[in-house]
Structures are given as C-alpha cells and as structure tokens.
Regions:
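Class I S-adenosyl-L-methionine-dependent methyltransferase catalytic core
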Residues: 1-365
C-alpha cells in the first residue's frame, strides 16, 4: 500500500477497480448533466494525487479528463475540474500530467489544481458560493483519502445543493486500526459527524465492528446529510478482509441507475471481491449475481398487490442491489411463465414475457 509520504506509487488492483468505476460513471454523468439545462458542471477530486503511477498508468484526474474528453456527443456546457492535492511534490507532478493532456482538451474545459487540503480548498469554494449567494453547479465529488481526513459536515453541505453527488472512499482497514487511539478522537468526530463511533471500540469481533462503523456512516448520510439514495460497495482482499467501502450518495434516481451500471460492469479482480454491501442481510457479489434474491425482494415488496412495470423498476433501482437491466428477463418473465404474476391491462398484441410498457399493471399472486 502507498505511503502518505510517497510522491508516486504502484497502482494496486483494488485501486484499478475503483478507477474503472469512476471512468464508467463519468462517461454517463458528463453527458446527462452537460447536455441538459445546466450551463456548467463541476468535477472535484478531493485527494487527487500526482496524476500518474510508478508504472506510468494514469491517475484519477487524468482518467476523469479523458472520460469527459472522449464523449461521442458534442458538449457545449462548461466543464470545470478541480483537483485538490495537499502534497506540493504531487501537486507539481499533477500539473505536469495535465499540461501534457492540455492540447487535446476542448476549450469548454476549465482545469484547476489547488495545492491544499480538501477541507481548506473545497471549504473555500463552498464558503465563496455562500458569501456570494450563488449555488454550487451540479457537482460530482470524488473523495478518496488515504485515511479519514474528510469532515462529514463538508459532505453534508455538498449534498444540500441540487444535482450534486458524492463518491466517498471509506478506508475501513485504516480506520479500524486507529479507531481506539486517543489522539484521533476529534478527527473521528469530524469524519463521522458525531461521537457515536465510540460505541464501536468495545465491540467484540471484527465483523461486528466493521458492520457497525459501515452502518453508522450510511445512517449519517441518510439522516444527517439527508441524502435520498445511498449505496455502499465493498472491496475485500484474498484474506476476506475489507479493504475499503465506496459510499455513493445522490438525490437522483437516474444517477443511482448509472452508478450501479458502472459497479456491475467491473470485471472480477482475481484476488479481490467486489460487492454491494448496503443491506447487511444480503451481500450481493457482482461477479456471481443471484437473481433468486432479486425475485424474493420483488415478491416480498409487491406480493398480493398490483404494481406497474414502472413501479417495479423504481423499486429495483432505488431499493435493491440490482440493475435496471436485471428485473425483466430474470424476474418478471419467469414469474409470469409459472403464473406468479399476470398482466391486468395488457395492450392488444402484447407478447407474454415482455414489459416495454411501463404503465402495464401486473398482479402479484
């Protein structure tokens, strides 16, 4: 694992997976927002690093720039990139990497590197917006620290603005190592946005503490930050130890749909396993999807009632680990084949097992 003192370091497999998720999501996020009614969108990388790894692989800032640059559609909206890096040597190297990309970037791209902490740099951006009575443009904030130097209050403030989203790396292994250290109490209070994390110190057994701290952060996103949709994704290593969680927060169902698409498309990483960890009673491995679990969830939610295809789709996207692409062929069609559901108002000529019409009502028996 990289040291906080290194200027560049080796790209590890679990980081490669994270970068692939970021690239896939930005490929969807940029056109959705920039082709809409917004004149500007903002991408923030709060712990940007040097922009390159020791093997020459691109870092997250370069991945973001290329994902936005390589869109197939023409984008006229201003796309601002704010890359924050506290280490001066890394920030300087990042500037060099961006300069190498600059000739290929469109004129509507605005790129800025700030050599400061995430708290100071982006806190200043938020404060400036507030002082001027301005709104933060639609923002995707990628917050990927080495440890826990991320004030929860800032995450919550970002989410008060319309069309803003966060992807936060929750470095569980490092957090767990220092959770009982007396010198870190105030830092953990800031990170969790409360003092409740202290209850996890006395928990016996690593799995209990893991779940407690995960659930506390998720609860804070839901209740303190008032984020409508929150999902967490877990990366485990070959020793079955949680390396990190990714917490994704959005108030937009379409954003959640696209993030889940990105997560599910990540290839198996050999010694690492990637899963949706939102529901403690149902961890869903992306490499081994169990559609019987989705069928059970749909049945539990709608059994004995009627629902439209659109109702079911919103439930699958918003409240399960599964994708929009999963529920028709893998759940509704086999349920209709065995008589567990039946269409209430099928249009003339409808083929059994087809659900293109979202207003189609289905009766669950």
């Amino acid at each position: 694992m990289a040291s906080t003192k290194d200027t560049v370091w080796e790209l590890e497999p679990h980081t490669r997976a994270k970068h692939e998720i970021l690239k896939r999501y930005l490929q969807a996020w940029v056109p959705i927002l920039s082709l809409g009614r917004f004149p500007e969108v903002l991408y923030v990388d709060g712990f940007a690093g040097p922009g390159i790894y020791s093997g020459g692989e691109p870092g997250s800032p370069i991945i973001a720039l290329r994902a936005a640059r390589d869109q197939r559609v023409h984008i006229t909206a201003k796309i601002s990139f704010l890359f924050i890096e506290n280490d001066p040597d890394r920030a300087e190297l990042l500037e060099e990497q961006i300069a190498a990309e600059a000739p290929t970037l469109p004129t509507n791209f605005q790129v800025q590197v700030m050599n400061d902490t995430f708290e100071a740099a982006f806190g200043g951006v938020l404060g400036s917006c507030k002082d001027r009575g301005q709104r933060l443009p639609p923002t995707f904030a990628f917050i990927d620290p080495f440890g826990w130097d991320v004030p929860f209050a800032m995450v919550a403030e970002i989410m008060t603005y319309r069309s803003c989203e966060v992807l936060v790396t929750f470095m569980y292994e490092e957090i767990n190592r220092f959770i009982g250290h007396p010198d870190q109490e105030k830092n953990f209070d800031k990170f969790f946005g409360c003092a409740d994390w202290r209850e996890g110190i006395a928990l016996v057994g690593p799995k209990k503490r893991n779940r407690f701290l995960h659930d506390l952060y998720m609860r804070q996103l839901h209740t303190a930050a008032k984020v409508m949709y929150v999902r967490s994704f877990k990366m485990q290593n070959e020793r079955d130890v949680t390396d990190y969680y990714l917490f994704y927060g959005t108030n937009n169902l379409r954003g959640l749909e696209k993030m889940k698409d990105a997560m599910w498309k990540i290839d198996a990483m050999g010694e690492f396993r990637f899963s949706d960890a939102t529901d403690p009673n149902q961890i869903v491995l992306f490499a081994e999807p169990r559609f019987d679990l989705l069928r059970m969830e749909v049945t539990n939610r709608f059994g004995g009632t009627e629902a439209t295809v659109g109702d079911i789709e919103r439930f699958v996207i918003g409240e399960t680990a599964f994708r929009k692409a999963h529920y028709k062929r893998n759940v509704l069609k086999p349920m209709e084949q065995v008589g567990e559901i039946e269409p209430v108002n099928p249009p003339p000529g409808r083929q059994p097992g087809t659900y293109a019409d979202k207003s189609l009502r289905l009766r669950f028996k």
